[in-house]
Amino acid sequence: MTTSKQSLFTHPIHLGLGATAIAQPEMTGMEFYAAYSERTASDGVEGRLVSMYRFDESWDSWEMHPSGDEVVLLVEGSMTLLQEMPDGSVATTILGPGDYAINAPGVWHTADVTEPATALFITAGLGTDHRPR
């Protein structure tokens, strides 16, 4: 299916079974994710959400994806990714434009932002959890 041009900032893409790429409805905040999970549940752990965000400040929570890897690709600016490892240690990775990091399944992660940053995410979102920072 061919769709008209969309902005990844407002309309994420679902990568699904059978090598499909499905444009998603407009991102509306946290309620988007609940509806997305329902729409794509039949893809199970193989489904991926491709999204892009601009950050002007550090994240206020940690998140974790238990079902698969998440790719974080920095497009612009600078971001420090913090990953809480299974042994409790925290790995720190500074990302610049074009750099990427992978959040492994079950690894809690957050980010510090000291200048505006834009990042692209490819997320195995099934079962994603959040906790306060």
PLM features per residue range, with description:
Residues 65, 86, 113-115:
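Short glycine/proline-enriched turns and hinge-like loops at secondary-structure junctions
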Residues 2-15, 110-133:
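Double-stranded beta-helix
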